[in-house]
Amino acid sequence: MSKTSNYLGSSRNIGSAGKLEGKIYLLTVFEAEEEWAYEDKMKYYRKIREAQQWLINEARRYGKNISFEDGCFGLEETIIIPDIKVGAGTGSENVDIIEPILIKLGYKGNLDFMEWVRANIDCDHCVVLVVVNKAGRSYALSHCEKTAPKFYLESCFLHTRYSSGQPAYPASIAHEICHCFGAWDLYDTWQTSQEIDRLASLHYPNSIMHRLDADINRLTIDEVTAWRVGLTETHHDFYDNFAPSTERQ
């Protein structure tokens, strides 16, 4: 499975979302190609809150206390972006989605926004959620050792509906936030494999990184993911079987 051509180095404990601990500043940005009803945005915002509470509860299982501070743009007045490209889970998604939005909001770019956060928000970590009112496949942009400095700011691009048109679950939000903190996918994707999917089905069938569920409380943060996101420092060699191609030399 190793593909040295897309090796990016480790994504664990690096970037604006280093470890799932302490206080996390979560900036949500609502964008769409046309005006989007406030009530519908609030319906999705409640899913974000449900995902946050689930993360708090799961961290507590590992003996960690976390909290969230929320920021928001676009809730009252939608940020209109024409011709938004949707995620498709191919690895060819747009990775420069955050900076143009932050510039539109008055910042000079990703790093300028991070300086503002450090100066104005009492927090340990920061994640930006871009919520787009369009069907597609959500994805996260987690910082790695070999990615450009501006990608230090970690973010998620969240679709309100799956490609099928079905409304997205809170579990999808929690899944992508975990990616920002270094979690690996535990199912078959462009950078993993069927073998990883098989092992996860056997050992971690209810992992948030392996599958989704309409009821997020049926899912857990498994031991591999707990190590990846910093809820535990315990590492077993077995965990390395789940490493994606981007973190295998």
What are these regions (language model features)?
Residues E31-E35, N133-S138, Y162-G165, Y187, ...:
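Solvent-exposed loop/turn segments at secondary-structure junctions
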Residues E154-A174:
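Short pre-active-site segment immediately N-terminal to the catalytic Zn-binding motif
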Residues M1-C123:
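Propeptide-to-catalytic entry region of secreted or membrane-anchored zinc metalloproteases
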Residues D40, Y44-K47, N94, F113, ...:
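Stable alpha-helical elements in mature extracytoplasmic
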Residues Y25-T28, V127-V131, C156-F157, H179-C180, ...:
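Structural recognition of the beta-strand scaffold that forms the well-ordered cores
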Residues A171, E176-Q194:
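Catalytic Zn2+-binding segment of zinc metalloproteases
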Residues G106-K150:
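Auxiliary, metal-adjacent structural segments of Zn-dependent hydrolase domains
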